[in-house]
Design a protein with these regions (language model features):
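Hydrophobic, well-ordered beta-alpha structural blocks that scaffold small-molecule cofactor pockets
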Residues: 1-128
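A general structural motif
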Residues: 20-22, 43-45, 78-82, 133-137, ...
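Short hydrophobic segments within beta-strands
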Residues: 25-26, 49, 85-87, 141, ...
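Accessory C-terminal segments flanking Radical SAM cores
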Residues: 31, 287-384
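Generic structural signal for small/hydrophobic residues in well-ordered secondary structure
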Residues: 83-84, 142, 146, 313
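N-terminal pre-core extensions flanking Radical SAM catalytic domains
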Residues: 104-162, 336-384
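Conserved alpha-helical substructure of the radical SAM core
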Residues: 118-221, 228-231
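Conserved AdoMet/S-adenosylmethionine-binding subsite of the radical SAM
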Residues: 198-312, 316-321, 326
């Protein structure tokens, strides 16, 4: 989207989302608990609504659970306003939404479906109601070294001209600046390359988690499982109860043996890990012919890339596009400079919601887009 009124793009929506003091999460299931993690940083009164008698008696995650009948009674008592986030399935939501509308409540003002709330409205109400910034996902690149040479690496790692481990002092400076402006990140992680190659990973994780753990929902440690974490890193992972996500590359020669050693090490140390096996990768199209401006604009509107990247005081909207440009020696997408005074919370909100000066990134001109818009499937982890 193209910026037309910077700092005020969401005024109409945001002003409608100011009038509440309580959040009710309808459904105390795993999705409900996920939404809980997304809203606790707001420091507002939160309760669950659920039909389960045991949950009503014991509570969930330390929070009160009301029955639907009790909630209706409480509705009449609220003079200070509330919102409801439904975490039920879509068909149940539609039925409940009809009831709420009949009772005079407004969809996407007084009540929300969880997916729309988390991806859109939470960002806006966080700023307009609480003056706080919520970011879905952010990566800080710690190293451009990797043990694999994937021809179609989504962040063009084999093609980076400068191979380096980012100095710890540089990372600390970026972390301090970022969290001085952003109040909560749902998913935060060191990026690579292969993160377990980074020699100061233990110090980086300790620095981040000892200072900013309350501003982070989950730390993402994504590895190709070819490098065993050292004792110092293992100690930090156990101390903060972190989970390692293993990218499965069992089609790469010799990978499975290394993976088995990696998994054994995790099991021996009681470290939780999850394996993710992709059936295919996407051809991002970095070497394809240029699109015209209209097509680039349309691609950006549809893409909804969730992965942000932060380095040298600048947030880049698209992690993948930024590193593709770096590999080509191009620096056209300037990003959002957090060191400037005019970069206030509403500007950060709008940037993260997809508002740009031109309405698209220069990298979109050569990109095929992310999942949902890109149908160009290619083999996983084909090596150079």
């Amino acid at each position: 989207m193209q910026w037309t009124n910077p700092g005020h793009q969401f005024d109409a929506i945001g002003n409608d989302l100011r009038n509440f003091q309580n959040i009710y999460i309808y459904g105390a299931s795993d999705i409900g608990k996920y939404i809980l993690k997304c809203v606790t940083f707001l420091k507002v009164e939160i309760s669950f609504i659920d039909k389960d008698l045991e949950k009503q008696q014991k509570g969930v995650e330390g929070y009160q659970v009301y029955s639907p009948e009790e909630f209706k009674e409480k509705c009449a008592e609220h003079d200070d306003g509330f919102i409801v986030v439904f975490t039920v399935n879509r068909s149940n939501y539609l039925n409940l939404a009809k009831e709420f509308i009949r009772d005079g409540y407004r969809e996407n003002v007084d009540f929300f479906f969880y997916d729309v709330f988390e991806k859109f409205y939470l960002n806006i109400l966080s700023v307009y109601k609480f003056n706080k910034i919520f970011v879905e996902q952010l990566s800080l690149m710690v190293t451009t070294y990797c043990t694999l040479k994937c021809k179609d690496c989504i962040i063009s790692m084999p093609y980076q001209k400068e191979k380096r481990h980012v100095p710890l002092s540089e990372l600390k400076k970026d972390v301090e600046l970022f969290f001085s402006k952003v109040d909560f990140v749902r998913y935060f992680g060191p990026g690579g390359g292969e993160i377990f190659l980074y020699p100061d990973l233990d110090q980086f994780l300790e620095y981040v988690l000892s200072r900013f753990s309350k501003q982070i929902g989950e730390v993402l440690l994504i590895s190709n499982a070819t490098v065993l974490p050292n004792e110092k890193v293992l100690r930090i992972i156990k101390k903060y109860n972190l989970t390692i996500r293993i990218s499965n590359y069992d089609n790469v020669k010799g990978w499975l043996e290394k993976r088995n050693k990696f998994v054994s090490l995790c099991e021996e140390n009681g470290i939780v890990f999850r394996e993710q096996k992709e059936e295919y990768w996407l051809d991002m199209g970095w070497n394809s012919e240029k699109k015209n401006v209209k097509l680039a604009y349309q691609l950006f509107e549809q893409c909804e890339m969730p992965c942000r990247e932060f380095s040298n005081g600048i947030e880049y909207y698209c992690l993948h596009g930024h590193f593709a440009e770096m590999a080509k020696g191009i620096h056209e997408d300037q990003g959002l400079d957090f060191t400037k005074e005019e970069t206030d919370k509403r500007i950060i909100l709008e940037y993260n919601m997809g508002y740009l000066k031109k309405g698209f990134l220069n990298s979109c001109i050569r990109c095929n887009g992310y999942f949902g818009v890109n149908n160009k499937r290619i083999p996983v982890a084909e090596q150079l």
